[in-house]
């Protein structure tokens, strides 16, 4: 399959169980072997209220580019944690203007790092990074997802051992008890596939990639990767943490688990 093209042949829609997603009647094997464009088309046609979440890195940009032909007005959820690199915020604004994205910015309940420090003390991201991520990423995303029936993510199986079993589609249960679908159209793609698509389609890249960063999160918890390191080895260096939590909460169907859940 030529990954550099926008879309392959459309996927014949499996029998969806859309209302409530209590027990998704989905042909997981067929979806797992479909190309990303077909998966996105299926999701756009089958899921009434759908959104995509991205931090404007390469995988997310590939999905946004594909969606220009499928659902250009799809809500794009962006978690503004208050700790992003200035380059991330500037690039997100640039791509939002360039592609006329329907951007929905999400923020934690405290609104700013300064207010968070007043409540929890300074540098919570060092003392309790799980709590910092829960406040600024997991909780605001969970609140936003109450408005949707499904969401799309750009995570891939080759990014880390914890993501190696990522399904193309899985169900998540929100704290309220609402069950939604989570779609990973690029689960089967490699980093090289993403790079090839980006180059072939002239998609701009996050400026920090040129400075040795491979996976870009909040500035206090992200460094450039060293020679021989994996893509996500620059995240939460020395903190015993590899995921922020937005890809592991409330799973109902799908094999991906965090170490704590295994």
What is the meaning of each model-derived region?
Residues 2-262:
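Nucleotide-activated chemistry modules centered on ATP-dependent adenylation/adenylyltransferase
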